[in-house]
Amino acid sequence: MSDGPRIRRVDERLGLSVLRAGLSPVTLVTYARDHVAVRTPSRPDLRSGNTLDLTAAPAPDELAAFVDRYGQTIGSLGAGHVQLRWETPLAPDAPSAAAVPDAEVVERARALGLTVAPLTVLLLDLLAPPAGGAAVELSPVPAPDGQPGGPVDRRWHATTVLYRYLAGDTPDDWRGNDDAAVAWSVEQQRELARIGRCQVWVALRHGMPVGRLSLLHDRQGLAVVEDVIVHPAHRRRGIARALLHRAIAHHLEADPSARVGLAAEPGSGADLLARRLGLRPHATVWIAASPAAD
């Protein structure tokens, strides 16, 4: 075997990169030899914005050192939780069932107060033709234009209301929503839209928003679809599929060589829908996290 430099596959560790493609403008990302530190000093409680992404799956006896590193680089800025992420590859034809974790890593993580959970990252292979049948109007939401209360601002507000259905379908579920967190997330999307890195799409039925999603990208050819939400009364009508297809197709028109990804819980509806649209499993991202501090 040659002793020359190893050439990495272009898509190595692309699963974690997909999860970072839509980070907010106030999130700091720094690269080290064995990890990528993601920090959001203004929101130390934000899980996706305060995490240590490892460049390789850790051995059981390495976890404690990474937890210490998290404390030094992220916890010192106020994060009350610990979160480590790493990825393991999946075959494109891998089943939707969750991958099996390394039992020794899980045991050691538990001893450190961390729970390990999987997330499937899928990448677009070939976009399947639209299924049709969704009786909705699909429309991109314009970037904010600086006119509070104007038509564009009202469009953003209308799509934001749909976030309540992430928590559940009933008013009791909605009362548990963290409205401040949703407002902050939407404001970050608005800022990304202003600089051309986020496109929100809405599905309208009789002029009313019944579905929405966000497609964000990093300006370097990697895009991620997030926050696909459909009103409970309008589900199982092909709206989510229609939204996904339109958003991805539109992005590929602007950047034909883009890699488009989506993260979903293994075997979930989002996982199965992505596969039907032509996205294929790429990696399992393992998330080892502690409970939030009281």
Residue locations for each model-derived region?
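A conserved beta-turn-beta hairpin within the catalytic core of GNAT-like acetyltransferases
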Residues: 44-52, 217-226, 235
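A short helix-loop-beta-strand connector motif used in the catalytic cores of GNAT acetyltransferases and
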Residues: 22-28, 78-80, 117-118, 190-202, ...
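Conserved beta-hairpin
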Residues: 29-33, 97-115, 197-213
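Acyl-donor-binding surface of acyltransferase catalytic domains
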Residues: 56, 62-161, 261, 268-270, ...
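N-terminal charged segments
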Residues: 1-77, 81, 90-102
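Flexible, substrate/cofactor-facing loop regions flanked by secondary structure
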Residues: 134-223
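Conserved acetyl-CoA-binding loop-helix of GNAT-fold acetyltransferases
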Residues: 63-71, 227-232, 236-253, 276
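Conserved beta-strand in the GNAT
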Residues: 34-40, 117-119, 200-202, 208-217, ...
